[in-house]
């Protein structure tokens, strides 16, 4: 393995600025790793070798001319395949979009291009971002590059599993994912990475193939906190093309890992039945580290942990069923092999063959909760409970600055583990409450499971308090990995 691919974004940037290496050298080193490893992990659906070389050469020309450049100029990256990339196939890992080539670029990927970042390829994912294991992709499951003591192929988490596996296996120093209910944070925990979900509205969703418009948010996976912050600085900021985007300037990170006098809340409801004693001990030891760094640890109550999963899946499935109505077999990726005498027959046949099992399951659920018989009992009730969840967090943040809990109730599980749908959904029990409340949160690796697989801890801050969130995560990282 070439040592170049192990460098952080900051070290790559410094080496590029000093002309010790070129962007093209960085790109070739990462492409070699992809060629050697991607057949095993299946982390990337598409590798854009020639486009990457062209962008690397442009970055090298800018550096050679001594132009003012961004931290990401010339740095390789991987993009989750739900972001529209102009002229580059974008599938959302679904048969329904297997031939879709966008004519426009998403806002966040445009910002990366403008900063000079070099896309190496599109990352595999759960189909339409529906999943927690990255086993529902039309292009096949993604394998976690780590195995620990289990000795079998493990999931990388989902739905941004390809983005996580790519960074963990050194295909790029960072990747762009998306997070609706935990799709960046849970893979970060399973693959030993830092995974940030910003406040809803911090980053534009324009050009992102939606799962649930009111919950989706761009997210970042990296191998350390500083790199994550550097990428967040680039992709954040107001976009008039997205009406839900907050009218804020792009984020500027003021690095300060001094967390003395910070109050950290420990939600008692996260001590759920069946949570392993090993994870509980790791949670307690993480809290003790923060205490030793000067933070005050306070027990808090978040009853919403017990019902947020229900609220999330009702709202998410309802919105997803509405979003997926656009895939009709006429636009995007028509299928000439399907013959039908009526439009209704075409819709039925196309969706039967184009959507996977998990997508169909959520479509049925979403259609039911939006029906005349289910709307009041399910969707309207879930929206009312969502307000209660927001109020609970608001009350807690009057007492503490950040909240600490495990990212997931377990480590990575076998790809062929055959979990039932409800068991799979329980993987998100600690991440969906903050998604429903639309708060910023981050997962940071803090240790290993009994099977030597990574485990992450989850930090949540108040709205638009990403700087505090990153600084607490940085303090924890510095203490754990001196």
Swiss-Prot record:
EC number assigned by the record: 6.3.5.7
Assembly mode: Heterotrimer of A, B and C subunits.
Assigned keywords, A-Z: ATP-binding, Ligase, Nucleotide-binding, Protein biosynthesis
Function as written in the Swiss-Prot or TrEMBL entry: Allows the formation of correctly charged Gln-tRNA(Gln) through the transamidation of misacylated Glu-tRNA(Gln) in organisms which lack glutaminyl-tRNA synthetase. The reaction takes place in the presence of glutamine and ATP through an activated gamma-phospho-Glu-tRNA(Gln).
Gene Ontology MF terms: ATP binding; glutaminyl-tRNA synthase (glutamine-hydrolyzing) activity
Gene encoding the protein: gatA
Organism this protein belongs to: Neorickettsia sennetsu (strain ATCC VR-367 / Miyayama)
Active site: 80, 159, 183
Official protein name in the record: Glutamyl-tRNA(Gln) amidotransferase subunit A
Keyword presence, ATP-binding: yes
